Amino acid sequence: MGQEQGTPWIQSTGHISTQKGEDGQKTPKLEHRNSTRLMGHYQKTMNQVVMPKQIVY
């Protein structure tokens, strides 16, 4: 059962990658900016999560 469920997931991911690649050629800068923004947001969220934990400790 597990293998059957994993196969379609990989196929769908590959399909998305192909579409992203075509779009990426047109706007690679947009994707890069988005990832950088996401990373900054992720770090900020992590800091907010870690800070209270340290105070509780």
From Swiss-Prot:
| Stretches of the chain forming a coiled coil according to its record | none
Q: Where is the composition biased (Polar residues)?
A: 1-19
Q: Where in the cell is it found?
A: Host nucleus; Host cytoplasm, Host cytosol
- Give me the ranges of the annotated region Disordered: 1-36
Q: Which Pfam families match?
A: PB1-F2
User: What Gene Ontology terms describe where this protein resides (cellular component)?
Assistant: host cell cytosol; host cell nucleus; membrane
InterPro entries per the UniProt record, alphabetical: Flu_proapoptotic_PB1-F2 (IPR021045)
Q: Locations of Basic and acidic residues compositional bias? A: 20-34
Q: Name one GO biological process term.
A: symbiont-mediated suppression of host cytoplasmic pattern recognition receptor signaling pathway via inhibition of MAVS activity
Organism's domain of life? Viruses
Keywords associated with the record: Host cytoplasm, Host nucleus
Q: Which family does it belong to?
A: Belongs to the influenza viruses PB1-F2 family.
What job does this protein perform?
Answer: May play an important role in promoting lung pathology in both primary viral infection and secondary bacterial infection.
Miscellaneous remark of the record = Is not encoded in all strains, and seems to be dispensable for replication.
Name by which UniProt lists this protein: Protein PB1-F2
Please give the organism. Answer: Influenza A virus (strain A/Brazil/11/1978 H1N1)
Query: What gene codes for this chain?
Result: PB1
